[in-house]
Swiss-Prot record:
Pfam families assigned to the protein according to its UniProt record, in alphabetical order: DUF2585 (PF10755)
GO CC annotation terms, alphabetical: plasma membrane
Species: Sphingopyxis alaskensis (strain DSM 13593 / LMG 18877 / RB2256)
Transmembrane annotation, as ranges: 8-28, 57-77, 143-163
Cystine pairings recorded for this chain: none
Family stated for the protein in its record: Belongs to the UPF0314 family.
UniProt protein name: UPF0314 protein Sala_3154
Amino acid sequence: MVGGISRTGWLVAAALVALLAAILIFMGRPPICPCGTVSLWHGTVQSNQNSQQISDWYSFSHIIHGFIFYGVLRWIMPERALWVPLAIAIGTEGAWEILENSPLIIDRYREVTMAFGYSGDSVLNSVSDTLFMVAGFLAAGRMRWWVTAALAIAFELFTLWTIRDNLTLNVLMLVSPVEAIKDWQAGG
């Protein structure tokens, strides 16, 4: 067992991540940044490399996804082996990554969020986003709930201050756009 997950659980997790990568490649997503480089971090939001590299400002949102999935799934199924809720979390995150890279959501991001030139994620970035979610999931299992909540709030405030965007604003702007928020974000 590693991190409270059995060998079987890790194999299931790896298979789900591999399936996500295969689906994204089948959808025509670029394996890596079309610019031809692979970077550990890319910090410029309004850039053709945003959502193309291993990590970026939105990696914090994926860690928060892991916090949320852990809390909800352990509450729903407290007696299940940890790999079961982890597999469900990976499947859910993977489904979002697939949807996020569909023309419907790419166009929606361009219309109503600060991601004016967004063209979707590279496969590398989507897989990395999923692995950041896994890290958040596993971290939440080792922290008290209030520490996890405080860290999520800190991540939200930090990214809001730094790039004028975060998970909360991203969801709000996708679901019910507010022109004043879009204007404020564009001013940053």
